[in-house]
């Protein structure tokens, strides 16, 4: 990674008006609008992962799953695809939102699992296989967490963000 210099601090533009609570709440989705065919593959993924975690005395609870589903329900690209009745975009957006939640909610629960022996073969290897089979972009980060944690799983990278959407980076650089 090449670090960029900032030679001059530029003043911020005019202060934007505060977002009203009413407007914010109008954006908030209070119910999951996914049908079973849409959400069950993700729920099944977490349940299968939970089976692997049980081999090392770990588990993901109902609240973890519920927070994942509601994060996905409120993800802007998911909401947009639902508004436009665009099934292809919905599937893609759901996968991106779910992958965010794997990193934010699930991977921290794996911290400290031993990366060798039975813990690796009974749990981490099975989880890795799930990630590979469903073509998630966090595999490199998962491998790094297994490799560089001094014998323990320690998630410490976000390389998947570089791969997931280069158009965002292009937009950001244009600013």
Can you annotate each of these PLM segments?
Residues 1-175:
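C-terminal regulatory/interaction module of P-loop NTP-utilizing enzymes
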């Amino acid at each position: 990674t090449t670090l960029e210099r900032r030679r001059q601090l530029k003043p911020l533009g005019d202060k934007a008006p505060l977002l009203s609570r009413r407007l914010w709440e109008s954006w908030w989705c209070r119910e999951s609008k996914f049908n079973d065919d849409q959400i069950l593959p993700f729920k099944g993924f977490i349940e299968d992962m939970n089976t692997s975690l049980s081999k090392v005395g770990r588990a993901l609870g109902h609240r973890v799953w519920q927070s994942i589903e509601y994060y996905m329900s409120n993800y802007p690209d998911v909401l947009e695809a639902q508004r436009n009745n665009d099934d292809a975009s919905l599937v893609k957006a759901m996968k991106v939102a779910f992958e965010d939640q794997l990193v934010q909610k699930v991977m921290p629960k794996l911290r400290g699992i031993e990366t060798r022996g039975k813990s690796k073969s009974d749990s981490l290897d099975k989880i890795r296989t799930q990630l590979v089979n469903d073509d998630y972009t966090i595999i490199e980060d998962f491998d790094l967490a297994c490799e560089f944690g001094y014998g323990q799983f320690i998630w410490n990278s976000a390389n998947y963000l570089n791969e997931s959407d280069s158009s965002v980076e292009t937009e950001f650089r244009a600013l």
